Structure formats: C-alpha cells, structure tokens
Amino acid sequence: DYPLAVLHRDISYVPQENFLFSDTLEENIAFGLEDRIADNPAILDAVKQAAKDACIHDNIMGFPDEYKTMVGERGVTLSGGQKQRSSIARALLKDSAILILDDSLSAVDTDTEEQILENLMETRQGKTTIVIAHRISTLQKADHVAVLSDGKLTEYGTPEELLELGGFYADISHKQQL
C-alpha cells in the first residue's frame, strides 16, 4: 500500500482529453507545484523550459500576451494539440518518477510528436515513462511495447521484435505506413 500523497508526488498522468483552467498559460503549466510563480519568479524559467521540451513554447511566444495569455475554461482558446502539449509541459515540470502519457500526442502532428519524444528521452533518463498510443510511430523508440486486446496482453517485446513476430503490432504498423 502506498499513501495517496506519495502516488500524487511520484506519478504524473496526461490524458488524451486534458483539463486546463480558466487562467494564464504559465499558471496552467505551473499548476500542482507547491510554489506560485508570483512567490518564486524562478519557477517561470522552469515553466518555459518545460514548455520548450513539450514543443509549445514557440506557440506561446506567438500569442499577444505570451505566457500571460488567458486560455479560458478547459482551454477553449487553444487547439487540441496546444492543449495536449500544455498538459505535457505541466507533467514535465512536475518531474515525477513515473510519467504516463495516455494517447496524449494524438492531436499533435508527427514531426512535433517526434521532437517531443526525443526531448522525453533526454529529460526523462533514469525515470519511467509509459506511453499509451494508437499510432505506432509513437512507439518506435520504446524500450518495450505491450500490446493489449480486449484488456489482455497479446504481444510484448521491443518494437523490432514485434515487427518480426508478424502479429497485430506488425499488421497495424504496416497499415499505418500506407
């Protein structure tokens, strides 16, 4: 048994449909930290680095109020990809031991997805990152892939091993390459 406070500290979860508050982008990304940006200006530098790692910084700098931009309830002023990347930045800023991305790159183009995944490989060394995805390209550099069907584990291995196996993973991979 783990105390709930430990789980909250050690696990970050980014769902496909994430939640943003009616607040500024900087406060949305910093949400969950113990210190507020107003109390500790150094947090803004960390927010900006997390935004860069999540490939949302350039978009934010293009907004008239940059990090002070109000996003509206549930992030209505942002695109789906911008919402997902803002939530990924929030999780990266928390720097948990375990990061779970639950199809949270689905609204991001493949080039941006690739850059985010490269950044994750650099920034999350020595930590556990679980990526749940329907797009096989998201999983190409994974250490291990678990394929689930009807809630059951049907295949497990490296991406290369699963391609060689010629099962469901390989079939979907070939279909998605077309």
Place the predicted regions along the sequence by residue.
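ABC ATPase nucleotide-binding domain helical subdomain, centered on the C-loop/LSGGQ "ABC signature"
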Residues: D1, H8, E26-E73, L117-E118, ...
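ABC nucleotide-binding domain signature
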Residues: A5, I11-P15, I130
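ABC ATPase nucleotide-binding domain signature
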Residues: D10-F19, R74-G75, I136
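C-terminal portion of ABC ATPase nucleotide-binding domains
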Residues: G62-E66, D103, E118, E122-G126, ...
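ABC ATPase nucleotide-binding domain "signature" region
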Residues: S79-G80, S86-A91, V131
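A short, proline-enriched helix->beta-strand linker immediately N-terminal to the Walker B motif
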Residues: L93-A97, G126
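Helix N-cap at the start of a conserved alpha-helix in ABC-type nucleotide-binding domains
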Residues: T110-T112
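Conserved H-loop
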Residues: G126-A133
